[in-house]
Amino acid sequence: MSAVIPPSGPSSAPPAGKIKAIVYFVGFTAALAGLLFGLDVGVISGANEFIQRDFKIDDARVEQIVSALLWGAVFGVLLSGFFSLRLGRRGTILLSALVFAVGSVLCALSPSPGFLTVARFFLGIAVGLAAFVAPLYLSEIAPQRVRGALIAMYQLMITIGIVLAFLSDTFFSTYADLEPLATKLSESVSTLAGGRGQMVMEGYLAMPWRWMLGIIALPAILMFLGMLLLPESPRWLVLKRRGPKALEVLRRLAGTEQEAERELAEIEASLQIEQKGFALFRQNRNFRRAIFLGVGLQVIQQFTGINVIMYYAPRILQEAGFDTTAQQMWGTVLVGTINVLATFIAIAFVDRLGRKPIMYTGFTVMGAGMLSLGAIFHLGLDGGAHDMTMSYLAIASLVIFIIGFAMSAGPIIWILCAEIFPLAGRDFGITCSTATNWTANAIVGMTFLTMLNTLGPGNTFLLYGALNAVFIVVFLALVPETKGVSLESIEKKLLGGARLREIGK
């Protein structure tokens, strides 16, 4: 779900020197931003039921709470260029870690639905900042030989974060005995506050959803402390005319002095290419075509229905006949785990089979999953009693859909968006596509329960299944195959006026 910043082309010089341990520490620490991203996206799925029960709110208000983080992320993405330029990549990640921590605590202590909505919007700003800047930092600081692997680790950490959020939700909703802990903590807080507020605090801390949302502050603090030990991006240092400091950083990270000097020369050469951004968008029709394609790809990714599952899986499982909280939560964990495992299918085959064949397969699998789920609701789950066979078929349909998404649209949409923009407008293009992703994400998040209540579960899932069929036609007509094609070749064909589907092979 976050933008992949493509590494620069391979150097003609042979790889030299051993990869240093600090490189992996840099990769892991920065990838914690992906973990936090996944945690914040996934945690609301299990918290929704408890928030709705404790605040006594309707489905429309739940949609507002879910989508608030996503609108905040749109705002964060739009701010990310400003902050990453002014504060540096490292400084912006530190800022996002602070906002993650503070926002998580504010969400946990929310006294009302309105406060929680605002707190989640604030938290979403951190998600948007991290989603843009963390991959950028990794792409700029990692030695060229391991750059792709470290960015892939960031992407993987997002899916792991979602699973951990589902597991955390399951623990706090089903197995944790919160009342004794709430009593002890509230007594401590009351003592510090002069004996006031113990009953109120105890009531707060006994609510599972507050722990679900608040526990995310811990990895945020860990990321903040880890980032304090890391250097700034050498590319940003060169941009700020601090070349000697950039070389010092590269020496810490590179295997040899020669490798450090070569990377510095490549950075200086790449910065000679002026980023024209919006000016290029206004002036060049062919660049506008690439922007519209990138925006369209992000809308397609979200309208497959993936985040319907990620945000509302327990509710879907409840509609499918899984009545207990434990059943709903463990079903959600299963979905998240499959999402992680199926991502490796794309990693293994994207450069062997190509982008479009995998996407055609993915849309077919996703469409089959959604259509079968809709049919199951119509045939066996809507309007009354049913046996558990239909319920298990429903969760099997969810798993089929998740496999289709994780092996295709999940990673490959981002790969395509990283490849189709010309170098002079790449930053602008990635910003537009990332902001669109979060906007479409928010629209999905704030409409699903309304669709469920208005159209019914069966028709809602049939609609998403039909959309996946339409997306096959869109890919046939508009999307290029970029496997094995250099970025320079794609740019030349695009700016030369070739049809979009022909700018690749």
Protein language model annotation of sequence segments:
Residues R252-E263:
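Short intracellular "coupling" helices and adjacent cytoplasmic loop segments at the cytosolic face
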Residues S2-K245, V249-R251, A265, L271-K505:
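Alpha-helical transmembrane bundle of multi-pass membrane proteins
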